[in-house]
Swiss-Prot record:
It comes from Alkaliphilus metalliredigens (strain QYMF). The gene is glmM. PROSITE patterns: PGM_PMM. One of its GO terms (molecular function) is phosphoglucosamine mutase activity. Mg(2+) binds at residues 100, 240, 242, 244. It holds the Pfam family PGM_PMM_IV. This is Phosphoglucosamine mutase.
Amino acid sequence: MGKLFGTDGIRGIANEELTPELAYQLGRVGAYVLIKGAKDAKVVIGRDTRISGDLLTSAITSGFLSMGVDVIDLGVIPTPAVAYLTRELQGNCGIVISASHNPAEYNGIKFFNHQGYKLPDEIEEQIETYILNNEEIENRVTGAAVGKRIELKEATRLYMDYLKTTIECRFEGLKIAMDLGNGAVYEAAPQLLKELGAEVIIVNDQPDGMNINEGCGSTHPEVVQRLVKENKADVGLSFDGDADRLIAVDNTGAIVDGDSMMAICGTNLNEKHILNKNTIVATVMSNIGLDLAMKEQGCQVVKTKVGDRYVLEEMIKEGYTLGGEQSGHIIFLKYNTTGDGLLTALQLIATVKESGKTLSELSGMMTSYPQVLVNAKVKNENKLAYMEDEVIMGEIKMIEEKMNGVGRVLIRPSGTEPLVRVMLEGQEQAELEVLAHGLAQLIESKLG
């Protein structure tokens, strides 16, 4: 597979790229690198609903057990629940078997440290080096020193009970429509919202191992949009396969994306004086409408590179409490260490309930400006050369002047392909299309 770890753990087609042999090795090496020398060591492991979940969970579990580490098996459970329970159960680390929003034939393995944070790059590199170099780890315990597997049947209940403590109201009188994506949240989400008093309408709650994300979930918001309209629901919720992100829909059927949810929840937290430093952390791809909406509330938006790990890094470094991505990865750092779809849903619904307004009224506080994204094919070695090209920089300056302060140009070299991504944001969609394609063609002609 070459380099094992990507930006969100290890991913691949299960039993072809991501094999049980590799998972077993990850268990052994993970135990050696993360836990060596720890007394009464234990790890916490959970998975989504993919058919290959059992295969990979069994294999990585065997690796840990062979190193004398106990494994607490949480079963099928959302990714953020693994992060929370790693802390709560005082695990030495946590492991998630999931490929998030990818199709069912894929799977992934992701590690959390003992605090529930993703591993830093240098630790992932250590694990990777051992495996890619086939370095043998001698430690093979025997007898009573072999690790034990412990099944924690009440894992989802512990997570749901914790989430209830993050809000101060109940949801009686609200009708919530949900697309559960045949994923990890298929039991927890409807159960929790019913317990909080909401009327619940659900689809895609029958996982069969192969239907996770299949025409449903957060990458197919049209499913929950239809459900909201048909049932006259107050709020629609659409989760991805491992429930670390959420896309919402308002009472009119309009999409409420990560930017809008951050504006709504951020304003609510700010009014309660619990939005630390009056700041939200977003990525460079977030809509300029978020900046303008938060400015009106006397708040600021700090921008990072694309990726929830960079958002989290900035939040930890500066002590911010709310951050996320347009795609629906929202981090409420006071409550969890990773994007959490179900937690975000509770915070959003609680804001609706406490405000006495509809979600469409609340989302009206932010105007999303049209965004146009065009890829320009360039040679790999030329991906940063646009900054030195006077003609390209002159064209960018001309476009920015034309926008007159209401809009922007963002050029992002791809990390994995010979591409430069051209993103324009402004008031007029048609004009943006012309300008973005023109700029992309210019970049291709000069650097392709």
